[in-house]
Amino acid sequence: VALPEVYGYLLSRCGRRALAEDLTAETFLAAVEAVRRPDPPELTTAWLIGVARRKLVDHWRRAAREERGLHAIEGGLSPTDDPWDERLDALVAREVLEDLGPHHQAALTLRYLDGLPVPQVAELLGRTVHATEALLVRARAAFRQTYADHVKEGRDD
């Protein structure tokens, strides 16, 4: 049931059928591996889309790393190509997002990272627009609290 939604999600973001097919396969392979764990997650469409998004991000990271490597070999990297603070903030934000529950992760990812409007997020999550708006309010609050906890832990170390 979720296969067309996961594939459509990936295809709409990467624009390449072969890549979308590969990432869809990787997503469902990750789902099979997750089910084999002692405490498996609830396999919902939202959870699968979250996994698919991470697979796509991983693909883009690998491609960017390869491109940077080629650029470095050609001698084109400058010190300004390494915005450390931005990367650190992004890393903390990613860790915080991964600490949230699957519904909060999916809602925040679709709305803010993928830039989808609330009605489309609602459709993908199988919720009403009103229920999705309420979910986003709770998800943002959970993100803020978890982010504050991460920042506090970082200072305590």
Annotate each language-model stretch with its function.
Residues 53, 57, 125-149:
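DNA-recognition helix of helix-turn-helix
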Residues 36-40, 49-71, 86, 149-150:
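Arg/Lys-rich amphipathic alpha helix in sigma70-family domain 2
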Residues 58, 66-95, 117:
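Internal acidic/polar
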Residues 98, 102-106, 114-134:
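Helix-turn-helix DNA-binding module
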